Amino acid sequence: MFQGETAITVDDKGRMAVPTAYRDLVTRVSGNRLVLTYNPFEAGCLWLYAEKEWERVRDDVMSKPNTQRVIRTLQQKLVGSSAVLELDANGRLSIPASHRNAVGIEKKAVLLGMGDKFELWSEQAHRALIQQTLSDGDLGDELLDLRL
């Protein structure tokens, strides 16, 4: 399980170091490979999955009939735009320029461990996310019994 927030620096070639605390786990569960894709729900954010979890997500998304526009868009953003990334010998991932540019990641980014995946945010989008507050009206009935 991935959890926690880490400030990340992205070099001129689009490489980012995976935090040391996660490297062994990524190697163990995914053989040094992660799958990168767009977060279809929030701008400024990419998702990184271990391959096995990605296969489950991909298969689930692609099992839906693409006769509805929302399903096609989800399939395009998640599966059609995905890229398999491999940790190099220095524990870095090369984030494709197309993905970095689409979400506004330049030199600074934020990596969030979100249980079964990572979220990679542009620094600006992450700051905006953190500054948002939730009100009781934002929580659905299924969340009202959460003890935080």
Swiss-Prot record:
Domain (SpoVT-AbrB) ranges: 5-53, 82-125
GO cellular component terms, semicolon-separated: cytoplasm; nucleoid
Source taxon at top rank: Bacteria
Keywords per UniProt: Cytoplasm, DNA-binding, Repeat, Transcription, Transcription regulation
BP terms from Gene Ontology: negative regulation of DNA-templated transcription initiation
InterPro entries to which the protein is assigned, alphabetical: MraZ, MraZ_C, MraZ_dom, MraZ_N, MraZ_sf, SpoVT-AbrB_dom, SpoVT-AbrB_sf
Subcellular location: Cytoplasm, Nucleoid
Primary localization: cytoplasm
Example of a GO MF term: transcription cis-regulatory region binding
Family named by the database record: Belongs to the MraZ family.
Subunit structure: Forms oligomers.
Family annotation (PANTHER family): TRANSCRIPTIONAL REGULATOR MRAZ
Protein's name according to its UniProt entry: Transcriptional regulator MraZ
Organism: Xanthomonas oryzae pv. oryzae (strain KACC10331 / KXO85)
